[in-house]
Amino acid sequence: LVEYLSNKNSMNDQEIAEHFQMLKSLQTNFAQIHRNHVKIKANSLNILLASHDDTTLEDVVCSAEDGCTLAEFPTTLEAAKFCREYRISIMMGTPNLVRGVSHSGNISARDLASKGLIDILSSDYIPSSLLMGAVKLGLIRKNLALGLQSVTQFPAEAAGLEDRGTIE
């Protein structure tokens, strides 16, 4: 991020330090207020809450306390295991699964798949990867139906859409 800021915005070390301090100040002053507002609003509208990029046990505990039932892209094996313990469904991106590596250096979806730690697959901005990802998950788990359910039934159920996601 330091390199990005210095190159993109021509910021020197002092300006970068001040920028980070300003961001920390904003987080300290507003993060919990905004987080509480989102929880209250989501609960009042019966909207599913999902966490994003949980990394540690602390992240997962905080997500569980907030009422999150879905973890979008846990970044470590530790976080994924704790999501399972806290009964938080785990969603990973199909591009990560198909490539076998995260584009940002996080846990590989294949590693999580091989440990049974993926419930739902998302396109992660590449819709054409969904079918290939579902088949790949089915092959890894030796259960093609499970792979297909990860892009149909399981996301629908996680979103509370009980009237879709399956063909009967």
What is each of the regions a protein language model found here?
Residues L1, L49-S51, L70-E72, I90-G93, ...:
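Hydrophobic faces of well-ordered beta-strands that scaffold small-molecule active sites
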Residues L57-A71:
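Acidic, glycine-rich loop-and-beta core segments that form the ion-binding/anion-interacting portion
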Residues E58-D59, E78-A79, I107-S108, T166:
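Short acidic active-site motifs
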Residues Y86-N96, G100-E168:
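His/Asp/Glu-enriched, well-ordered alpha-helical/loop segment
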Residues L1-D54, E65, D124:
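Metal-coordinating catalytic core of metallo-dependent amide/deamination hydrolases
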Residues N29-I33, A50-D53, A71-A80, R99-G105:
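A general structural motif
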Residues L1, D54-T56, T76, P95-L97, ...:
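Active-site beta-loop-alpha junctions enriched in small/polar residues
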